[in-house]
Amino acid sequence: MVDAPDILIDSRRTAIGDVPEIVYGSFALDDGNFTLDDQTRTALINADDRIVEYIRPFLGGEELLHGTRRWCLWLRAANPSNLRKIPLILERINAVRDWRSSRDRATTRKLAATPTLFAEIRQPFSDYIAIPTVSSERRNFIPMALLSAEVIASNQLYVVAGATLFHFGILSSTMHNAWVRAVCGRLESRYRYSAAIVYNNYPWPFTPAAEQAKASDAQVHKAQAAIEAAARAVLDARAAHPGSSLADLYDPLTMPADLLKAHQRLDAAVDKAYQLAGGPKTYAGDAERVAFLFSLYQRQTGLLAAAPAPRRRRGAASS
């Protein structure tokens, strides 16, 4: 434990900083008719190769972390005249319509009118950061990924659209992971990431507090560039181990030395950025990181004009 103020963390719909919005991935509500495993995908393509145009990789937390493969039919921009020429797709569309029509919930039955579409579509049109909603407490870092818009994220992932290497670097750092461990909920003992509590309350280094610390534009740009370079090095270190899943790479017992070193360099770059917001040069551990982040949170939220949202969770500055 360290000396730190007792702070109430609000549940927020938007982030306290000027950062991209975080949302859940898309929700099919299809009785499995849009979802394909490897065997089904191959069988469909062998039967009618026109189907390949409409098949996308489909990732939830399991697929992201463990490298298992899953696919989906993604028909958001499909030409209706083309779909009508592919009987195997029409069969699945019809099955979705019939299943939704048979449900008890009125909202689900209403969705039967659009059987080509997922029930909830939040798929970005650009690259995005994917964050598993639940991650093992054994990991020092929650494994996140930068994904192409061609990869469809399920509602078992959080999606940060329009994110850059800078955002990926901050979110992948020990600083952010210390915040997660301090304020997130738990599923059994695993960390449950949260948009409203974790992400939207996280105090980023270059929001009002950096101005309070009198950081120059040149200092900010230099710090951002250093984080981006270090984040790229983390991705490069991952790529140097093909065949290893994120679960393999981020198990503390099997984490490769080059990836660990890349994260240490990323942490150094992120910590230096937080110095511009008044942070110390070094931290003895998570407790000191969290104590500083809570003080920065107070400074940043104190500058917000909007009234705080209803209070949900009490944060404790402890390791």
At which residue positions do the language-model features occur?
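S-adenosyl-L-methionine
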Residues: 1-319
